[in-house]
Design a protein with these regions (language model features):
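Charge-dense, helix-prone N-terminal extensions
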Residues: 1-116
């Protein structure tokens, strides 16, 4: 499994847009709010970060390959530095859940516009 597979999955989420922020970080957003960060660009990705449910934050940060995401940990974001930490299906589910968590915080009107 590679970080590229997670980036592809993030891009496939409904309403997802991609941008390069802070000079080199690849950011997937929904409704202007980021839900997945990988970097740097260009070059091979060495880590990615995404939002998780509050009840999963401590569990995940206790696993090898996961840590609290710099600058975003208080918002329950984790950083994944080892793409082999979990099975691809579970990592894809976590990225999908990150998208859902951010989407839920958007206005109902914007949610309707973004969802097919």
């Amino acid at each position: 499994m590679s970080f590229a597979a997670l980036k592809t999955h993030a891009m496939s989420r409904p309403g997802a847009t991609v941008d390069i922020k802070w000079g080199a970080d690849w950011v997937a957003s929904v409704g202007g709010k980021m839900f997945f960060v990988a970097g740097p660009e260009p070059g091979p990705c060495k880590a990615c970060s995404f939002k998780v449910d509050e009840h999963r934050f401590l569990e995940l940060t206790g696993l090898h390959g996961f840590s609290p995401a710099p600058y975003l940990a208080r918002a329950k974001w984790v950083q994944l530095s080892d793409a082999r930490a979990l099975a691809l299906a579970e990592l894809r589910a976590l990225v999908g859940r990150s998208h859902e968590l951010v989407l839920q915080r958007l206005s109902k009107k914007l949610q309707r516009e973004l969802m097919p």
